[in-house]
Amino acid sequence: MASLIYRQLLANSYAVDLSDEIQSVGSEKNQRVTVNPGPFAQTGYAPVNWGPGEVNDPTVVQPVLDGPYQPASFDLPVGNWMLLAPTGPGVVVEGTDNSGRWLSVILIEPGVTSETRTYTMFGSSKQVVVSNVSDTKWKFVEMMKTAVDGDYRNGGTLLSDTKLYGMMKYGERLFIYEGETPNVTTKGYIVTNYASVEVRPYSDFYIISRSQESACTEYINNGLPPIQNTRNVVPVAISSRSIKQREEQANEDIIVSKTSLWKEMQYNRDIIIRFKFDNSIIKSGGLGYKWAEISFKAANYQYNYIRDGEEVTAHTTCSVNGVNDFSFNGGSLPTDFAISRYEVIKENSYVYIDYWDDSQAFRNMVYVRSLAANLNDVMCSAGDYSFKLPAGQWPVMKGGAVTLHTAGVTLSTQFTDFVSLNSLRFRFRLAVEEPSFTITRTRVSKLYGLPAANPNGGREYYEVAGRFSLISLVPSNDDYQTPIMNSVTVRQDLERRLNELREEFNNLSQEIAVSQLIDLAMLPLDMFSMFSGIEGTVNAAKSMATNVMRKFKSSKLASSVSMLTNSLSDAASSVSRSSSIRSIGSTASAWANISEQTQDAVSEVATISSQVSQISGKLRLKEITTQTEGMNFDDISAAVLKAKIDRSIQVDQNAFPDVIAEASEKFIRNRAYRVIDGDEAFEAGTDGRFFAYKVETLEEMPFNIGKFADLVTNSPVISAIIDFKTLKNLNDNYGITREQAFNLLRSNPKVLRGFIDQNDPIIKNRIEQLIMQCRL
């Protein structure tokens, strides 16, 4: 029998203990190693103190006093005061438009009587009679001419305690300060070409915006702030204030800060995200009118696009969260169209798109701050999906649409077939759109959302354009790479492959022929015949067997066998010894609302049901440890496992132990077991349903829980491959003899094969249902 594989694994589990002991002895050798972690030894943290990151503030902060700058000829920006701070007498500043006005300002110290002095103005020496009758204030005198070779004449004056002077170009005029501190005023001279007036200061100066003119006037009247008069303030060249005009790049790498070991890099990127949905459509067994599941699943997509003239290779993984489960049942007949479950995403759902490309931004994505993104919206509309029925017109699922709106971005790791990628996860919230979706020839209509049947609508991909920005802490030396904190372990990679393998296994259920399964279930499958078809296991058969037994030893089945005797004894002794009760699932079922039954009877049914469910959960353990001639559920599950392994293209020696252990636990969850006492049969399922009936007539009788408890302790336990409902349905429709009934009750494989060879639809449908329960 095919279930020999499970018995062999249970019987030889001692080999695992020996193997583990050998490995434990070999791993006891220790070595002392001293590691100097250095100054950056904080486990899991970057060598900096992270703050909240940058916080955007719409307020524009403009400095009041910009400077001081060293004397140099430059084009004074329009709308800015130049505040001059000379240290001694002489020419302070010159300004001209080179066409109709030349202005030179000289400074005279206090207490000067009328005298002639020589000044160099605009490159020529000129003698000027000057005087300053004030004993405390310095005097600024404007010397002006209107022709290149003309004579200078005196203009306005400024008497100052602070020895400060101001000049500005604005509104086609050249403005200066006049009067006497602390009550100075401004005056403007009309200049023909004021925007091109060149100013040459001969002293240190400051730049003050016209919007801060009141502050400039305050400085001239009362002097500069104290900090500007310390030795720590050093004038710099005016060229340091110049900002080179350049075209802003949408895709750039900016060094935010840098030390000897680390630097912060800001990466700005324009991106194009292409993604697609994937789905899984599984049909139920039977005549072909039932669908078990239509669901979303993660989809990987790799593509290339051009960014700033450079080809970029990108990879996306699209997944969904918060799906809504719908179902449709057209009736109870085998030929009635039905969908057990189909998924739809709508307003309460989210779509996650993990994005990675081969640019520098994703090279060292470990310590990241200031992560932001801005993406366009995209509308996703479904296409048609036809449910291909064996006969009649096909129902078609049509319509359905949602719009994806960006809702945030975080760091993530996406897994490909060969490598893990540090990536960005873009989260999208959904809004339903027209049209609604319907299933033609059914009552399903005017439902909103995106169903999983054909979510891409025939498109190869959906596309979203946008950009992201982030600041990443990376090594200062570009040749170094930081370790991936969320690196892929062997177990994570195995889990990913197991998920793909589970999906493949579940889809292979429809490819297994029922007649082939019965033959395979009767073969004595052992470990080596089970995995003989797996590539690369012939040379490693010994280690493969050890790995399988080690994994199987920790399974629920193996851990329960050691407690088999006590569990059965305790369960049998704890049941209520009531005389009888009607069968669950009969015409007068306790699951129905029967007015004739009292509340006490219903409570008794519930109690007996829980007790029967508890006992039936132990019956598999007894059956697997006692050999019978009939076929059991483990024969079928092992045969299905072998058939799927032979057809699988993804199973390998690493995943095989997990597959064996998981199959032993999850294949055929809903099982029923029976015991026979003469002409009476007692049948109990793991779902709590129970029946008692006559073998010859298949008439139900009261269920004696006490007798059932005694029988399961002392009699052989038989798998109800053909359960009571199927058996009664077969008898009512076709009629069966007493001998056939006994053989079906004992799960005789030859009789089962005979019914299948005759293409009996009821028996065949029952076996197909068991195959569909063999899911990981």
Swiss-Prot record:
Keywords: Capsid protein, Coiled coil, Disulfide bond, Hemagglutinin, Host cell membrane, Host cytoplasm, Host cytoskeleton, Host endoplasmic reticulum, Host membrane, Host-virus interaction, Membrane, Outer capsid protein, Viral attachment to host cell, Viral penetration into host cytoplasm, Viral penetration via permeabilization of host membrane, Virion, Virus entry into host cell. It holds the Pfam family VP4_helical. SUPFAM superfamilies: Concanavalin A-like lectins/glucanases, VP4 membrane interaction domain. The record marks 231-232, 241-242 as: Cleavage. Residues 389-409 are annotated as: Hydrophobic. Residues 484-518 form a coiled coil. A motif (KID motif) lies at residues 644-646. A motif (DGE motif) lies at residues 308-310. Residues 65-224 are annotated as: Spike head. GO terms for cellular component: host cell endoplasmic reticulum-Golgi intermediate compartment; host cell plasma membrane; host cell rough endoplasmic reticulum; host cytoskeleton; membrane; viral outer capsid. The record marks 246-247 as: Probable cleavage. Residues 248-479 are annotated as: Spike body and stalk (antigen domain). Disulfide bonds join 318-380. Residues 510-776 are annotated as: Spike foot. A motif (YGL motif) lies at residues 448-450. InterPro entries: ConA-like_dom_sf, Rota_A_VP4, Rota_VP4_MID, Rota_VP4_MID_sf, VP4_concanavalin-like, VP4_helical. One of its GO terms (biological process) is permeabilization of host organelle membrane involved in viral entry into host cell. In group A rotaviruses, VP4 defines the P serotype. Belongs to the rotavirus VP4 family. This is Outer capsid protein VP4. It comes from Rotavirus A (isolate RVA/Cow/Thailand/61A/1988/G10P7[5]) (RV-A). The lineage of its organism: Viruses, Riboviria, Orthornavirae, Duplornaviricota, Resentoviricetes.
